[in-house]
Amino acid sequence: MAELLLGVNIDHIATLRNARGTDYPDPVQAAFIAEQAGADGITVHLREDRRHITDRDVRILRQTLHTRMNLEMAVTEEMLAIAVETRPHFCCLVPEKRQEVTTEGGLDVAGQRDKMRDACARLAAAGIQVSLFIDADERQINAAAEVGAPFIEIHTGCYANAETDAEQAKELARIASAATLAARLGLKVNAGHGLTYHNVKAIAALPEMHELNIGHAIIGRAVMTGLKEAVAEMKRLMLEARG
């Protein structure tokens, strides 16, 4: 069974800061608190429209984090250049649409193998480990292995948004099957999107899971209980699921 890690996404600390155009709350300070509370890594999504995390945030976080930076980004020339210059520990390549509220669905790796292969090779040459954010789909998992990504991150949105227990169980089975296939192909398996304190345990219990990236639920809880307590509680639930 893989060791289970928690990556805390701090995008919405920046969302709150940018809502008033101030310099607070500071994502760098939030990252430090999250690390102290047990986060194994810090995830940030540098979007093309810079709606929350900024280039400056990325630079400072890379210099100050005590754990690992996971930079989520679209597969564009601009973002690849920023990643190669900044050299985060991990890059998670995601699809991106300007009009979306949050990332909707996974990358179509199978439909753009050459582009993904080139991006993975370029990032790997800079010493960056690459993850591809994909749906729990056999075709996409096979394609991820073919293009040379060492990690995938399974999109858990359909599981998280399921309206009935039966629908959620079906999505969980799909994720479990996808994780098993990925591990068999030599891929390390992460997961994220829509995971909360109420639904995380079933995903955390899957033996192939290496890291869960969780943001909105933790920041939402932090408003009520404080960030340190919110991160620690999520980590406790994840480890509890592993027995």
Curated annotation (Swiss-Prot):
Keywords: Cytoplasm, Pyridoxine biosynthesis, Transferase. It catalyses: 3-amino-2-oxopropyl phosphate + 1-deoxy-D-xylulose 5-phosphate = pyridoxine 5'-phosphate + phosphate + 2 H2O + H(+). It is found in: Cytoplasm. GO terms for molecular function: pyridoxine 5'-phosphate synthase activity. Catalyzes the complicated ring closure reaction between the two acyclic compounds 1-deoxy-D-xylulose-5-phosphate (DXP) and 3-amino-2-oxopropyl phosphate (1-amino-acetone-3-phosphate or AAP) to form pyridoxine 5'-phosphate (PNP) and inorganic phosphate. Homooctamer; tetramer of dimers. This is Pyridoxine 5'-phosphate synthase. It comes from Salmonella typhi.
